[in-house]
A protein has these predicted regions:
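Sec-dependent N-terminal signal peptides
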Residues: 1-15
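Repetitive, compositionally biased segments used for assembly/scaffolding
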Residues: 19-112
Length: 112
């Protein structure tokens, strides 16, 4: 019985992480949870991001992002900055779902 409760508690703790990484791009920097800069090359990125067409495609904090229409639907609000030095997170948009991943795990907490 104790085992059942333990598993239930663990499942509840990790449940939010299993949902889609729903992202909304805000208009102003002060509205954002994370400031993002898009780099030109994979090797410069902290995170390789794949833009998922459907929220069911995106999972957890693995770089599979689904951009939502409304701010209230988002897990994270991001702002695209003009300069690399202003960013909390450097991303590269990859055309391949299989390539989506963290290159700098130290910044992974930004998207939880």
């Amino acid at each position: 019985m104790k085992r059942f409760y333990f598993i239930s508690i663990i499942a509840l703790f990790f449940a939010p992480m299993s949902f889609a990484q729903k992202v909304y791009s805000v208009e102003y920097q002060n509205q954002a949870d994370v400031k993002v800069f898009v780099v030109d090359y994979e090797s410069q990125a902290d995170l390789l991001v794949y833009k998922a067409k459907y929220k069911s495609e995106a999972k957890g904090n693995e770089g599979l992002w689904h951009f939502v229409e409304y701010q209230s639907q988002a897990d994270k609000k991001i702002y695209f900055v003009k300069y690399k030095s202003q960013a909390d997170l450097l991303i590269y948009f990859t055309p391949y779902k299989s390539k989506a991943s963290w290159r700098n795990k130290q910044k992974q907490h930004l998207m939880f």
